[in-house]
Amino acid sequence: MILTLVVMFLAVAVTIGFTGLCSFNPGKPENGPVREVDAAPFVNVEARRVDYPVRLPKVPEGWTSNSTRAGMAAGKQTTIIGYVTASGAFIQVTQTDAEAGQLPSDGKNRLRDGTTDVEGTTWTKYEPAEDNVRRVWVGDLGDSRAIIEGTGNDEEFTQLAAAMQKAEPIDPDATMPDSSQPQQTASETPSAPAK
């Protein structure tokens, strides 16, 4: 019986080996290209959907927005934009009207690690107390709160915090063109055929 299993294993290994459907590549995996997401249309929709001011931060050159989604924090709605930084780290900002004292509210084990001042705004820092938990900064922007979370370094967290503070809230009443459709100008508008 064992001999039969060995023969079957060898037959399968040889068959798969010749087809090239299986490969062995030791070493660290390489990251593929970052999938870029245009955050502007999402933020414009969110500005109409939620009851707090929503901002689109102007991030440093080399950063790529790669995710957008709505969520919940401390029982309140959130607007979330994720970025891959120029160094390849992931960092996201969550905007909400939940109270700063209730954040972060994801139930993950973090320890409060003091505060840092970014251009006059105090951000409370939380460091992970266990593996697979990201660090977090929470800032009160007055009319909303921002939660920065990710694998970025202090400089990248500071850059995103400053960008959030400088960003103006999106006007929910402003009409935004549909970016997926080309816009016609008055000179391009087709006229009715002459009779």
Language-model regions: role of each:
Residues 29, 80, 94-98, 105-109, ...:
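Surface-exposed beta-strand edges and their flanking turn/coil or helix-capping segments
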Residues 2-12, 16-18, 54, 59, ...:
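Generic hydrophobic secondary-structure signal
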Residues 34-128:
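Short, solvent-exposed recognition patches
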